[in-house]
Every structure is written in C-alpha cells, then in structure tokens.
C-alpha cells in the first residue's frame, strides 16, 4: 500500500513576492501595510532560504526552482496550487482562479521528476476559460493511502471538476463547506488546506468551520473509519495557520510535521502531544509570507511522488 507522504519536495524561490490583489478578493488571510515590494521580497527570501536549509538539515530532499521577475508572479512561492504528482507517474495541472497565478506554470518542474519518459500528464487548466477552478493540493487534501479527496468547496474548488478528478484518479470524494468569520459574516474558506491537514496516523481538522452538522459528521466519520487520530483545532488556530501543515518523511524514515512558527506557537500541549506521538515537529519562520501571501508552510511545498 502506498504511503501518504514523501521525502522529495519542490519549492519555488521567489523573485518578486508581494501582496496579490487578485487573490485577496477571497483570501482573507492576506494582510497589507505600507512596506515596499522590495522590503517584502527581501524578508520573504530570507524566510524561504532558511526554511529550505532547515528542511535539508532534517533530511528532506528539497528541489528548488528560482523564479524569474518576468512575468511577475507574486504567489509563485505557493506551487502546490497549480500541480500535483502521483505514484502512477502522473502529474496533474490545475485551473487557477487568479489570472496572474496562471503564469506560474512552468515546464521546469519536469527537470526534477525521476521518470519523464512515460509521464502521464492530466491537464485540467483549460477549464479556466469556463471559470471552473480546482487549485491543486490547496483545494484538495488527499489521503493518498486510502484514496480519499477531502475538499472544501469554494470559488477556487469547483465540485464538477472535483468529481472529474476523483473519477480520473480513483479517489472517493468527501466534499463539504467550511467558513471563517469576517466582520461578523461567515465567508467561505478559500482553500481546504488551511483548515485541514492529513497525516499517516492523524489528521488536523477545524471541525467548527464546517457549519453544516451533517457535513461535519461525514468528514469526521471518514477520518475515524481510517483510524486517524483527529487533532481538533479552533478557528483562531486556523488564523495562525495551524491547519496549513504538511507531513513529510526524512531520509532515515522519520515522519516530520512541517509547520510555521506562528502555527507552532498556537499549539496546545494536548495537540502537540498527539502530533509528537507520530512525528517530529519542524517549525519554520515564514511570518512575512503568511502575512502578505495568506498561505503558510504547507502551501510552499509541492510533494514529488514521481
């Protein structure tokens, strides 16, 4: 049976990271201030390089693509949204909500695949023209071992394409709706991977964000069926990106839970103890990237299974 986790990942080193106006319309985690683009980029670059160094030092095989200034892709640091890889020597390309994020696609990812001779490319990106979006492992939290796709439906996660993905990949669909409170209003959470994360033996879940109690129970039931120990997190902890973690395995077979320093500081002792039963926690400081990009450690990592 295939594992849910990998040792090999791809990350994109930013050339001009910045607050993205096009994504801010439904990513309420993005914040802005009067810092210059240069200041933001310089801080993000330091955080990125330190994160790569920490990952390598703990035994993760990190492949890095250096982004270019042209075309300007302010969110290129989050490559997991536009492609995913799978054990069947398959790469899936996804349709993106923001027009400037569509420019992130690059054939340079193929340089890091072990076997490109019989690569199966599943390309859904043309569905952008029909305003149908499914933003990779931002929209999809995949349990690769049990072949389940958890998806919080939103402007960036279309159920029609979710159905197609699940049929093509042989996954069971677990679709639901999750929300956050913005100015006393319940607004859709833009990506599933900010409120949920999948490990081999545990799952992190903000159940409180799933307002529909039937949907909430269905998600919990699927996780319990697969004997996942659930780490329940609050909506406030989602704001600290505790849902945006990723489990990797190092070169010695030790499971590593990568999360931001912001997320780590939000952990309760009980939550920390559950995760540390199975994983070594690796906190990384990406506060600039979180603030202006509205994404955290998990968003920065594209897993390579081929």
Predicted feature locations:
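The feature marks the mature, well-folded catalytic cores of soluble enzymes
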Residues: 1-306
């Amino acid at each position: 049976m295939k594992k849910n986790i990998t040792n090999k990942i791809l990350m994109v080193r930013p050339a001009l990271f910045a607050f993205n106006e096009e994504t801010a319309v439904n990513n309420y985690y993005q914040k802005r201030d009067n810092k210059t683009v240069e200041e933001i980029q310089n801080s993000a670059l330091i955080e990125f390089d330190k994160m790569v160094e920490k990952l390598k030092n703990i035994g993760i095989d990190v492949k890095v693509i250096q982004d270019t200034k042209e075309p300007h892709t302010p969110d290129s640091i989050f490559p997991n949204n536009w492609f995913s890889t799978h054990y069947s020597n398959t790469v899936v390309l996804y349709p993106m909500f923001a027009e400037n994020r569509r420019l992130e696609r690059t054939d340079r990812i193929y340089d890091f695949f072990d076997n490109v001779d019989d690569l199966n490319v599943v390309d859904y990106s043309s569905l952008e023209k029909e305003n149908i979006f499914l933003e990779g492992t931002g929209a999809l939290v995949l349990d690769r071992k049990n072949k389940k796709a958890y998806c919080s439906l939103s402007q960036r996660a279309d159920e029609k394409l979710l159905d197609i993905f699940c049929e093509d990949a042989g996954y069971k669909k677990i679709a639901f709706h999750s929300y956050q409170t913005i100015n006393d209003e319940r607004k859709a959470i833009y990506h599933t991977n900010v409120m949920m994360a999948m490990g081999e033996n545990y799952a992190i879940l903000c159940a409180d964000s799933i307002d529909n109690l039937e949907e909430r129970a269905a998600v919990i039931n699927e996780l319990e069926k697969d004997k996942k120990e659930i780490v329940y997190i609050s909506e406030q902890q989602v704001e600290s990106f505790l849902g945006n973690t990723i489990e990797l395995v190092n070169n010695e077979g030790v499971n590593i839970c990568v999360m931001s320093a912001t997320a780590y500081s939000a952990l309760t002792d009980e939550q920390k103890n559950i995760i540390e039963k199975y994983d070594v926690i690796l906190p990384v400081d990406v506060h600039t990237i979180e603030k202006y990009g509205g994404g955290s450690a998990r968003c920065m990592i594209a897993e390579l299974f081929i």
